[in-house]
Design a protein with these regions (language model features):
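TPR repeat positional signature
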Residues: 51, 119, 123-126, 231, ...
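Heptad-repeat amphipathic alpha-helical coiled-coil interaction surface used
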Residues: 123, 130, 235, 239-242, ...
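Internal, well-ordered domain-core segments that constitute the primary functional module
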Residues: 118-175
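Extended, well-ordered alpha-helical scaffold segments
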Residues: 4-16, 62-75, 135-154, 237, ...
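Extended glycan-interaction surfaces of carbohydrate-active proteins
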Residues: 2-45, 70-112, 162-226, 263-355, ...
């Protein structure tokens, strides 16, 4: 009997438990860890939003490991609530991190975690894993840590009255080399790998010289971006926290989160929504110049329940259904096909054309929330077929579906959640 695409993806996800699982006790951090590395050959440390996505995927295979993944992420949390975008579990045993990691960590934290954030996906992962595992008791013990994390974000990365988070490095967006950030990085014209790499390391050095202190970095403004994806997931995370608190009878906390989520969403609609092109645009610099390239980062705000239905419908029609922009054979490309920077093979630089499963999953969720069931189903089917055909790869050619980048890539197993839930 021929194996179905969902069945093939399930088998691939199951193999991650053999190839990507890392367990042990870290004496530097003082905690036990059990997580899936994003890719055993390329990315061996725990990464923030990778773990959030991987937990959702693996919950369909091993719910207990999915819970351990998220508990491990929280085990490295600082006392003030901060969680770094990379945690170097077992570094003394596995060897030192890549040299670039030193430039993204404070002195004294080099064998524990980085000093950068990633898009807030933790609350959503906790909620989804609890749903898949049918375990309402999973979230309550984590709420204090989740509250502390969200408090840190609001107090340290939202300096203005609009409530929007500011990122201080393109790595904090999770889409490191997206052309969305070329202007903020001082890139004019074509961005080469070595040129952008030098700019990245130079920015790391400047942030390191500011001790990765949020006040100093925001004051210096070397990289000051209110990113559309980071803030969409922030607002979505706040709304998720409201639901989690409400389920536990914490109505006052729930109301506070609802208010903040609404405020951030309203600010995005006012400042970021480009109605002429039906896309959200990141804000560059203190002047809040709108980013110009059409990228998937401007579509992720579809995840927000608070955006008007007509706005969501316009984005779906003019962007996701457009063959000139994002409706390719294996959607959704990270950059619109109409953009000069579009590279479907990801040659040299990533996030400049290939399709990524994590953003597909976010868009699929957003389309479902806004009544675009047919388009959501088409996206799920294409994503599952792509992964079944090419395997768990880091990203994919949107024309051919060819798998590219790292192999045994954990978050691409999100296709399983799309298959199981569609």
């Amino acid at each position: 009997m021929r194996e179905t695409a969902p069945g093939a993806v399930r088998m691939m996800a199951n193999r991650l438990l053999d190839t990507n699982l890392r367990q042990g006790t870290d004496r530097a951090i003082g905690a036990h860890y059990s997580y899936l590395c994003p890719s055993p050959h390329v990315y061996k440390w725990q990464r923030f939003w990778d773990s959030c996505f991987q937990a959702i995927a693996i919950a369909h295979i091993d719910p207990e490991q999915a819970k351990s993944e998220l508990r491990t992420l929280l085990a490295a949390q600082d006392d003030d609530g901060f969680i770094g975008h990379i945690t170097f579990w077992g570094a003394k045993l596995r060897g030192l991190p890549h040299p670039s990691a030193y430039g993204q960590s404070r002195p004294g934290e080099r064998l524990t975690h980085s000093a950068l954030i990633q898009p807030p996906m933790l609350a959503q992962a906790v909620e989804r894993v609890a749903e898949i595992a049918h375990d309402p008791a999973f979230a309550p013990p984590l709420m204090a840590a989740l509250d502390s994390y969200h408090n840190w974000l609001a107090e340290n990365r939202a300096p203005d009255a609009d409530g929007l988070l500011v990122i201080v490095s393109p790595y904090e967006s999770g889409a490191d080399q997206s052309p969305t950030f070329d202007e903020a990085m001082g890139i004019r014209g074509r961005a080469g790998r070595w040129r952008l790499g030098f700019k990245d390391r130079w920015l790391d050095l400047r942030n390191w010289l500011n001790d990765y202190d949020p006040t100093k970095m925001l004051g210096a403004g070397h990289f000051h971006v209110k990113d559309s994806t980071v803030n969409a997931l922030y607002a979505d995370s706040l709304a998720t926290m409201a639901r989690l608190h409400r389920r536990q009878g914490n109505d006052q906390s729930a109301a506070a989160y609802v208010g903040l989520a609404s405020h951030v969403t309203d600010s995005m609609l006012i400042k970021m929504l480009d109605r002429s092109d039906a896309i959200f645009r990141s804000l560059i610099g203190r002047e809040e110049r709108r980013s110009e390239p059409l990228t998937v980062l401007g579509l992720v705000p579809l995840i927000l329940e608070g955006i008007p239905r007509e706005v969501a419908a316009e984005i779906a029609e003019r962007q996701l259904r457009s063959h000139d922009h994002f409706s390719l054979r294996y959607p959704v490309p990270s950059v619109a096909a109409s953009e000069p920077s579009f590279d479907p093979r990801g040659t040299g630089l990533i996030w400049r054309g290939p399709t990524w499963v994590n953003t597909n999953w976010l868009l699929w969720r957003g389309l479902q929330r806004h009544g675009e069931a047919e388009l959501a189903g088409q996206l799920a089917d294409a994503t599952v077929a792509m992964v079944a055909q090419a395997g768990l790869r880091e990203f994919y050619n949107p024309h051919s579906g060819q798998g590219l980048g790292a192999e045994s890539f954990g978050w691409s197993a999100l296709a399983l959640d799309m298959a199981e839930s569609s």
